[in-house]
Amino acid sequence: MRASRFLFATLRETPNDAEVISHQLMLRAGMIRKLASGLYTWLPMGTRVLKKVDAIVREEMNRSGAMEVFMPVTQPASLWEESGRYEQYGPELLRFKDRHDNPFVLGPTHEEVITDLARNELKSYKQLPVNFYQIQTKFRDEIRPRFGVMRSREFIMKDAYSFHATQESLQETYDVMYDTYSRIFTRLGLDFRPVQADTGSIGGSASHEFHVLAASGEDDIAFSTESDYAANVEMAEAVLVGERAAPTQEFKLVETPNQKTIADVCQFLNADPKQSVKALLVQGVADEKGNVPVVALFLRGDHELNEIKAEKHPLVAAPLAFATEEQLQAFGLTAGFTGPQGLVEKGITVIVDRAASVLSDFVAGANEADKHAIGVNWERDAQITEVFDLRNVVEGDPSPDGKGTLQIKRGIEVGHIFQLGTKYSEALGCKVLGEDGKPFTVTMGCYGIGVTRVVAAAIEQNYDDKGIIWPQAIAPFEIAIVPMNAHKSPRTLEAAEALYAELQAQGFDVLLDDRNERPGVKFSDLELMGIPHRIVIGEKGLDAGTFEYKGRRDAEASNLTKEELLAKLAR
């Protein structure tokens, strides 16, 4: 591509509404332009990157044996009513009617559409397993679109859906897709982690997320220093460490006026938060008569409650909800001063986190306003109904697989795979005839990659103060050739044209910067756009038989012979 025929839409200043670095650099590099809130036009520079991501995803999906389809973004509302998600999905689902007053939605996902296709086209177990995928636009009417294409309303996804006769077959395809995703993100040149994840609103029995590690990520990822273990912090198990020591202190009540938070109390008492417990009083599961009990959750003072773990306890109501003031009053409890002493005797279920369960001589609420207890010990002073993993893991915790300790970093979710089971096939009646001639409900899996999000995530992981530093596989151009004073020096232009033709013939994606611009402007643009290799051709270099080469990550340029240059580019 000749730069003189290409749209350069670079900006010198960062737009005020761009918050994260990927949004800033995509605007400045001329990759995207905002059309409306959460809607972006992809310019030629951005489209080249997008298509390269698209190509790698498509190649690996085809390699996995999946078959490409293309489904409508506009979907009949009746399908969503069948699945039960028409009302469940909430305002992110854009609903509308056509001129004939028929209700439709703009698809944020395609489970309903693909299940409808499968129930009409798949008739026998002999057609299973099968895996369909598409690369298609989605629309979610986000209340606050932000971070550019990272959280936009309209975006491109690769979504795949598999259909199976057995759980074993689903597991086989799930494993294939896990490996396929790992190959995709490796080829994209990203530092990523596959992590165990919660199945969330889509549902199902097993789930992994694929996260690109970046400081701007929205999720906390815990991974082992010595193994492949990795999990979303929401899912990572907090391993029990140590045993409870025998009591050495007497139980005692102390005045703590107006000290309600654990931090305030520990500072007031000159105590270590690690030697304290804090209470969270939540609603339990209602009984047959509709009575809602109170459940007391206790954690170590320096730990945070993991709501997803708490909601998985069979005695805790989901979604998690705090006990009401009326419920607290019924048991004579005061928020901010609740301790475990006497709660079991009052009929309150006391669930204690593993780390809190091994404490002795600890600080706790006194169950009286403006008072706390010190020297509290389990069994002697307070009873436990059950010990349960309730907390978020922290850096330095033992890895659940017994290998190394946990590190925690921020991650950007770019892929997600689920074992859906029969959630959608049951709801939409997707059945095939079995070997015995009887119909059975098929089992499903689904697998998504945020294609547009991958582009932003790659930038969040690869940039400096000059601009983007693309992994070569998805750079808009792999190589930029800059002939110095090309409009005055036919010799440099001729040499640039010859090298341009040669590199293109070798399969490189090359930009010949033949613009009538100052060298400084060209260099700034090329660094901002993140082109991995820059070759400058000048009169002095031609006299010496060398080319000036600079890799995007290099601090200094170097003069190379043609043979050295070609060897460098071939690596």
Swiss-Prot record:
The keyword ATP-binding applies. GO terms for cellular component: cytosol. Pfam families: HGTP_anticodon (PF03129), tRNA-synt_2b (PF00587), tRNA_edit (PF04073). Homodimer. It comes from the Bacteria. This is Proline--tRNA ligase. GO terms for biological process: prolyl-tRNA aminoacylation. The keyword 4Fe-4S does not apply. It catalyses: tRNA(Pro) + L-proline + ATP = L-prolyl-tRNA(Pro) + AMP + diphosphate. Gene3D superfamilies: Anticodon-binding domain, Bira Bifunctional Protein, Domain 2. Belongs to the class-II aminoacyl-tRNA synthetase family. ProS type 1 subfamily. It is an enzyme of class 6 (ligase).
